[in-house]
């Protein structure tokens, strides 16, 4: 034994506390733990002299006071070899169901530490055990530590059929089914396009049915109140409608609320990976089983979607339209004092907000407690750079009323000093639209108290400098004549009759307005797009107007003038009917 101890001690530079027998070994390799050290940390070579000494002189079934046996140790070894295990069995190792102080038998450690579960090794470790009723958490152990990778279904089914309890929970309250739902999401994401058979989720559905047949509680809740359906729908990956249906058909309750007061449907609608067909499936299933959702519930779903889903891609707009239509939510309808547009701007969801403005939501409508969208942005302390959000609002230009523009004068002091880029654009547009903006500033400049309030955020000097530059450019804009008006008026009105003049100015490299060049480009592009839409509508009208129509008595310029006043939304609706949303840009 001394030779074994010396060889192992010379090779060890650190001994984990777990191998210390309550201090008896005083941090050293001893005859009590040398066998455990060897099997835990050495690359065991069955032909080596040391291995032969260990087999001959060591008690291969000895347990330390922590409960660890040599078999526990070897199945944890990252250089585990099945051939060594077979030799250990041949030499009398038999403590397959002995537990360490954590309640783990050797099989626990093999399931946790093995990179790939070998079926033959698994059988060697499980066959001597009649059933797993005394180690009922084996299935949970395997899924908890391996849910991120490829699972071995032979292992899953054997653990389940030999008595591992599917309702065991970890310290967070997660059951085997919770972890399996996590596995499906993670593994589905990386394998979705690899094979057609995988996308049908046959193995996954079969195991869900089997684990429930063996007693798994489909509605077991974690410490934060999540059911397996909550858990599956919360994952930020692609979701399979087949898995959702498997859970629903076996009794998943869509009414259960977690500690955040969210049902599975609510959790799903908060997910950026939400898709329309699964959402429709969930809503239809819920209504068939528990009754029609009330409008208030529909409002809440829409609120959650806007708050948490940033509206990237056409699928997000499809879901937005679906919710608006399904629950018949009107443009001036409030939920908790706000319309959907207020919610969008309050949560910096510019994509959704832009679409809502496009379909006719009024950007100037106040909340029920008389707040503007500007107020909502400035009150939200989670918005670090509020000028960017305000710029997104005034980017809608003429849809923002003059009183709203005027109100921004009193909000300037709340801009962050790091928002120079957007602050310049905001002030430039305010001065263009509101002729009194500069006058107010000049008047307040005489008041020292006015200057001092800027100290907390953006400096007064910076604001003053921007306003002076804007005034200089405004005077130059007024000097440039365009037909019967000037460039200043064209930018204020965006009359598409002057689009060709604006295009010429935009393309002229010799003409520059540092504070307004970007706005000129935006107006030019907007007017070009609007002009093309108007032309398409007029062409369509020409093909449908006959001699009996009242429109046929109107001069073409009058018809054009009427059509020009329509919004892009109405023009697209005239052109494409119900498919107009496909042409939203």
Swiss-Prot record:
SUPFAM superfamilies to which the protein is assigned, alphabetical: Ankyrin repeat
Molecular function in Gene Ontology: protein sequestering activity
Pfam name, any one: PRANC
GO biological process annotation, one example: symbiont-mediated suppression of host NF-kappaB cascade
InterPro entries: Ankyrin_rpt (IPR002110), Ankyrin_rpt-contain_sf (IPR036770), PRANC_domain (IPR018272)
GO cellular component terms listed in the entry, alphabetical order: host cell nucleus
PROSITE patterns reported for this sequence: ANK_REP_REGION, ANK_REPEAT
Region (PRANC/F-box-like): 554-571
ANK repeat extents: 66-98, 172-220, 224-256, 297-333, 336-365
Keyword annotations of the record: ANK repeat, Repeat
Free-text note on domains in this protein's UniProt record: Ankyrin repeats may mediate protein-protein interactions.
Record function comment: May be involved in virus-host protein interaction through the ankyrin repeats and PRANC regions.
Family that this chain belongs to: Belongs to the orthopoxvirus OPG003 family.
Protein name from the UniProt record: Ankyrin repeat protein OPG003
Organism: Variola virus (isolate Human/India/Ind3/1967)
């Amino acid at each position: 034994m001394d030779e074994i101890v010396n060889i192992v001690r010379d090779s060890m530079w650190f001994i984990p506390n777990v191998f210390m027998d309550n201090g008896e070994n005083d941090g050293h390799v001893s005859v009590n733990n040398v066998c455990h050290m060897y099997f835990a940390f050495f690359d065991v070579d069955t032909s080596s002299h040391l291995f032969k000494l260990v087999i001959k002189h060591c008690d291969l079934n000895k347990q330390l006071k922590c409960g660890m046996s040599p078999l526990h140790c070897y199945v944890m070894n990252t250089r585990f070899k099945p051939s060594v295990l077979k030799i250990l069995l041949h030499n009398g190792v038999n403590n397959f169901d002995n537990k360490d102080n954590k309640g783990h038998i050797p099989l626990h450690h093999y399931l946790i530490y093995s990179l790939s579960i070998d079926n033959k090794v698994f059988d060697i470790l499980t066959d001597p055990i009649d059933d797993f009723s005394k180690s009922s958490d084996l299935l949970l152990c395997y899924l908890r530590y391996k849910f991120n990778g490829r699972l071995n279904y032979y292992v899953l089914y054997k653990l389940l059929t030999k008595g591992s309890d599917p309702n065991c929970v970890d310290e967070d309250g997660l059951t085997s089914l919770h972890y399996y739902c996590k596995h499906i999401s993670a593994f589905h994401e990386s394998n979705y396009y690899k094979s057609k058979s995988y996308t049908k989720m046959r193995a996954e559905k079969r195991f869900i049915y089997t684990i429930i047949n063996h007693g798994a509680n489909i509605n077991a809740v974690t410490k934060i109140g999540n059911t397996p359906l909550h858990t599956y729908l919360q994952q930020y990956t692609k979701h399979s409608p087949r898995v959702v249906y498997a859970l629903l058909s076996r009794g998943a309750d869509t009414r259960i609320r977690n500690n955040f007061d969210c049902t599975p449907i609510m959790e799903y609608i908060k997910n950026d990976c939400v898709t329309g067909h699964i959402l429709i499936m969930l809503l239809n299933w819920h209504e068939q089983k528990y009754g029609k959702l009330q409008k208030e519930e529909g409002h809440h779903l829409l609120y959650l979607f806007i708050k948490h889903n940033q509206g990237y891609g056409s699928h997000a707009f499809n879901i937005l339209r679906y919710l608006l239509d399904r629950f018949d939510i009107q443009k001036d309808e409030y939920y908790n004092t706000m319309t959907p547009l207020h919610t969008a701007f309050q949560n910096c969801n510019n994509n959704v907000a832009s679409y809502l403005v496009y379909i006719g939501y009024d950007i100037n409508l106040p909340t029920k407690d008389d707040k503007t969208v500007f107020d909502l942005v400035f009150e939200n302390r989670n918005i670090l750079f509020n000028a960017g959000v305000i710029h997104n609002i005034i980017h809608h230009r003429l849809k923002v009323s003059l009183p709203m523009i005027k109100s921004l004068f009193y909000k300037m002091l709340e801009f962050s000093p790091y928002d120079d880029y957007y602050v310049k654009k905001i002030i430039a547009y305010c001065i263009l639209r509101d002729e009194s903006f500069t006058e107010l500033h000049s008047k307040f400049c005489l008041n020292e108290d006015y200057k001092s309030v800027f100290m907390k955020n953006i400096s007064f000097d910076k604001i003053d400098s921007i306003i002076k530059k804007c005034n200089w450019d405004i005077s130059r804009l007024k000097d440039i004549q365009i037909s019967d008006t000037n460039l200043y008026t064209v930018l204020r009105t965006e009359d598409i009759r002057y689009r060709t003049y604006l295009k010429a100015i935009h393309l002229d490299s010799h003409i520059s307005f540092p504070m307004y060049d970007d706005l000129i480009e935006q107006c030019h592009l907007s007017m070009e797009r609007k002009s093309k839409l108007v032309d398409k509508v007029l062409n369509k009208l020409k093909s449908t107007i006959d001699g009996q129509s009242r429109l046929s008595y109107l001069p073409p310029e009058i018809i054009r003038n009427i059509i020009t006043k329509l919004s892009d939304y109405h023009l697209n609706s005239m052109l494409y009917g119900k498919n107009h949303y496909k042409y939203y840009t």
